[in-house]
């Protein structure tokens, strides 16, 4: 399972260190005003779904 953060303008940023890194990046994005950042997961790295 792969985890990442989907940004409204730039797409998905894949987090190589897992879900904890993805959660931290989502939190930092929201603190810095990127309110559309969403935590996402993927099995193949191509099709992402929000969790």
Swiss-Prot record:
Superkingdom assignment: Viruses
Underlying gene: 62
Protein's recorded name: Gene 62 protein
């Amino acid at each position: 399972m792969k985890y990442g953060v989907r940004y409204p303008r730039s797409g998905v940023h894949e987090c190589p260190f897992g879900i904890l890194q993805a959660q931290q990046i989502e939190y930092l994005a929201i603190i810095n005003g990127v309110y559309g950042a969403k935590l996402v997961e993927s099995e193949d790295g191509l099709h992402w779904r929000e969790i």
